[in-house]
Amino acid sequence: MQLHVRHESEYTYDYPVALGPQTLYLYPRAYPYQRLLTYQLTIDPKPSRIVRNIDVEGNVQQLVYFDHPTRHLCVTAEMELQSDEFNSFDFVLFPFDTQHLPFQYPTPLVDLLQPYLKQVSASDQVRQWAEHIAAGANRQTTAFLMALNQTIREFTYEVREEGAPFPPEQTLTGGKGSCRDYTTLFIAACRSLGIAARFVSGYLAGNPQQEHQLHAWAEVYLPGAGWRGFDPTEGSVVVNRHIFLTSTAKPELAAPISGTYAGQASSTLRSELVFL
């Protein structure tokens, strides 16, 4: 299938400001089953320079520079991708002892995965909850991940367009949250049992509730399978309806646009996301 999306973000300032460098994560990541067909980035006012990099976690990062004051900033990214369906469970966990929890990653991977194993929860509440789910899944790794996904899916979904993810304990206790809250809880539960997990930001097609805003989901690293996506908001594995913009150990680094400006001005943001 082909996915075609346009994402426009417009900042307005009540007085002229000098824009500092702006960091964009609006360029889709490549995956074996998904490839970019067309991409267009439009920025007003016209930047003095755009530098496209690969950041420390392998994401495409675009740094944008300006040399004139402005009262607005409009960034529009339009992209079209070929996204092929595939079997997300077509793998064999190896070494075989990784098929059950708890397990140890092969020694060469441990250092590389440390950022994705760092504990998120400040208390033991999430670990105890994760242990209960794992016991119900006979401590099978894949069965645990699916059960965790479905358990969070049963929470009460809330639209929350701004703000950092809630602490995982808050989402667990309240039984409600946004997609980024669900994802942060999923990650915390995985890491509490020694499964490397990271936060992914991007777009989701085919869900009217989600496709007009940024979406968040998780990826876990499974020996023999690599990084595999799980979407606790959908209660599903990630196949071909998701477009990946950035994946990171720290959710606060996943913003599509970040930067500073100099000037005594307030700003407002208007955002529009459309699948075409």
List PLM regions with ranges:
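Intrinsically disordered, low-complexity N-terminal segments that are enriched in acidic
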Residues: 1-90, 94-101
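Short N-terminal helix-initiation segments at or just after the protein's N-terminus
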Residues: 14-25, 157-167, 215-216
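Flexible, active-site-adjacent loop/turn segments at secondary-structure boundaries
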Residues: 15, 41, 64, 111-115, ...
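Secondary-structure boundary elements
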Residues: 101-177, 185, 251, 261-275
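Short low-complexity stretches enriched in small and charged residues
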Residues: 28-37, 85, 152-153, 173-178, ...
